[in-house]
């Protein structure tokens, strides 16, 4: 057994692991990266964020072709199978792997591909694919192993018609009807994707509102859009059992209802990847969902062991995970890069997409903050009209007296890009965070960013 010594060992090469490894390496530390796959990138690159967003992009292109009258001159609407669309989308994975492999090489981070587990608080043993065991001894270890879909024991996920958000990418046909159980972010995103391919979708939600953490107006807009696009949303429903058939699946609900479809996609929660880490050897406990607890420095109860990304729970976003990993390493190397990551914009890649940052109306009302609202509807924006994307709006919440921007909520074309302008202003100190910025700034024309000026004028016109 070979023994290697490092300053920092990172478990997991997803966004959190990458952020941690790069920060530690750039601070001059000797760093090793361990990943259970034979390629870097983690679940984000291989099964999650990257393939699903690339898939969404391909579906949007198909939808634009099929709904734009201009293209009828060259033929009728085209329908593509799910495997064909996925094959096109998967091309980006190899490009991402190549880019990320280059990052590690340039920063002299040693890569170990195999199953890593704790032997003790400073030692990780890696069982490689060829059976060779490597021992890595480190001053500090960062757990960034991510998460996987939660699988209830009473559901047969080996059945060929039952999928989760990892295995759905192996779907070999296009179902006519699909049940999606779980209307969280992942469930809503896949509902949009399959609906865009002409699939009838039954979206089962165990709550009374879609994505209830969003501003209620944005949530309602998504619900309305779903209802117009072959997506039936069933609220306040819980599964009783799932019955797999030769030609489909029947979902039995506790309300007594039964839904039959060609396939079922389970999107109800995620579990931290900690069960194979030998956590009992270091005294770090995990909760019922396999997640570990950390402090604001991303340190566990063991002083030299840290955690970042999905494995620590909220907010379980790739963007936040990268910054959490970077901050965990910042706590170790003490180079001024640490920050507690809590100002994360929400990006939801439904069709149309959603993004927000800051407070929503419910939160401000509950806190008795005197706020006002400014809105810009995309149907009136020149750039949205040119792009043929009239659905959506930008909504700015601001303080009536100080004009401080308190929240930005966007639904529609390029929402995940648009939100960053508001985020930048909200992060300005003191009086520099003001709605007046949008009125006194010249925006390129025509752009979607111009919606900020329109919304600002709308909000100011409401004041008296």
Curated annotation (Swiss-Prot):
Q: What is this protein called?
A: Soluble pyridine nucleotide transhydrogenase
Q: Specify whether Oxidoreductase is a keyword of the entry.
A: yes
Q: Where in the cell is it found?
A: Cytoplasm
Q: Which GO terms describe its biological process?
A: 2-oxoglutarate metabolic process; NADP metabolic process
EC number(s) of the enzyme? Answer: 1.6.1.1
Subunit note: Homooligomer; probably composed of four stacked rings of 7 or 8 monomers. Forms filamentous structures.
Q: Which family does it belong to?
A: Belongs to the class-I pyridine nucleotide-disulfide oxidoreductase family.
Instruction: State the NCBIfam families in the record.
Output: PRK05249.1
* Keywords assigned by UniProt, alphabetized: Cytoplasm, FAD, Flavoprotein, NAD, NADP, Oxidoreductase
Q: Which domain of life is it from?
A: Bacteria
Q: What is its main location?
A: cytoplasm
GO function terms (MF aspect): dihydrolipoyl dehydrogenase (NADH) activity; flavin adenine dinucleotide binding; NAD(P)+ transhydrogenase (Si-specific) activity
Instruction: Tell me a GO cellular component.
Output: cytosol
**InterPro entries reported in the protein's UniProt record:** Class-I_Pyr_Nuc-Dis_Oxidored, FAD/NAD-bd_sf, FAD/NAD-binding_dom, FAD/NAD-linked_Rdtase_dimer_sf, Pyr_nuc-diS_OxRdtase, Pyr_nucl-diS_OxRdtase_dimer, STH_gammaproteobact
What does the Swiss-Prot or TrEMBL cofactor note state? Binds 1 FAD per subunit.
Q: Which Pfam families match?
A: Pyr_redox_2 (PF07992), Pyr_redox_dim (PF02852)
Q: Which cysteines are joined by disulfide bonds?
A: none
Please list the reactions this protein catalyses.
NAD(+) + NADPH = NADH + NADP(+)
Catalytic EC class: oxidoreductase
Residues binding FAD: 35-44
Q: Does the keyword Hydrolase apply?
A: no
């Amino acid at each position: 057994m070979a023994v290697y010594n490092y300053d920092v060992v990172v478990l997991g090469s997803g966004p959190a692991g990458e952020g941690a490894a790069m920060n530690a390496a750039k601070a001059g530390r000797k760093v090793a990266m361990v990943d259970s796959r034979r390629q870097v990138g983690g679940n984000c690159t291989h099964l999650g964020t990257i393939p699903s967003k690339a898939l969404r992009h391909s579906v949007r292109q198909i939808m634009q072709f099929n709904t734009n009258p201009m293209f009828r001159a060259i033929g009728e609407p085209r329908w593509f199978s799910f495997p064909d669309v996925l094959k096109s989308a998967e091309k980006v994975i190899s490009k991402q792997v190549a880019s990320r492999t280059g990052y590690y090489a340039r920063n002299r981070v040693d890569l170990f591909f195999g199953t890593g587990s704790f032997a003790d608080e400073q030692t990780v043993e890696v069982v490689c694919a060829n059976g060779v065991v490597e021992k890595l001894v480190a001053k500090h270890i960062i757990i960034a192993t991510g998460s996987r879909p939660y699988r209830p024991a009473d559901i047969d996920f080996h059945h060929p018609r039952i999928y989760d958000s990892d295995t759905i990418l192996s779907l070999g046909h296009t179902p006519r009807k699909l049940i999606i159980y779980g209307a969280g972010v992942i469930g809503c995103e896949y509902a949009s994707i399959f609906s865009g391919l002409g699939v009838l979708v039954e979206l089962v939600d165990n709550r009374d509102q879609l994505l209830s953490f969003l501003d209620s107006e944005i949530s309602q807009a998504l619900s309305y859009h779903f209802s117009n696009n072959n997506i039936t949303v069933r609220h306040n429903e819980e599964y009783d059992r799932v019955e797999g058939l030769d030609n489909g699946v029947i979902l039995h609900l506790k309300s007594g209802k039964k839904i039959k479809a060609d396939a079922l996609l389970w999107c109800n929660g995620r579990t931290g990847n900690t069960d194979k880490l030998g956590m009992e050897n270091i005294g770090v406990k995990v909760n019922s969902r396999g997640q570990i607890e950390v402090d604001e420095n991303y340190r566990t109860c063991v002083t030299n062991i840290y955690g970042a990304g999905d494995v620590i729970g909220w907010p379980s976003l790739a963007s936040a995970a990268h910054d959490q990993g970077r901050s965990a390493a910042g706590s170790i190397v003490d180079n001024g890069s640490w920050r507690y990551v809590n100002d994360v914009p929400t990006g939801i890649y439904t069709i149309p997409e959603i993004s927000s940052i800051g407070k929503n109306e419910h939160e401000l009302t509950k806190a008795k903050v005197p706020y006002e609202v400014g809105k810009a509807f995309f149907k009136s924006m020149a750039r949205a009209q040119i792009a043929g994307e009239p659905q959506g709006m930008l909504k700015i919440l601001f303080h009536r007296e100080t004009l401080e921007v308190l929240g930005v909520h966007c639904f529609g074309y390029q929402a995940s890009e648009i939100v960053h302008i508001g985020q930048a202003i909200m992060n300005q100190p003191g009086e520099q965070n003001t709605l007046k910025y949008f009125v006194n700034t010249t925006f390129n024309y025509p752009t979607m960013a111009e919606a900020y000026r329109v919304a600002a004028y709308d909000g100011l016109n409401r004041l008296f």
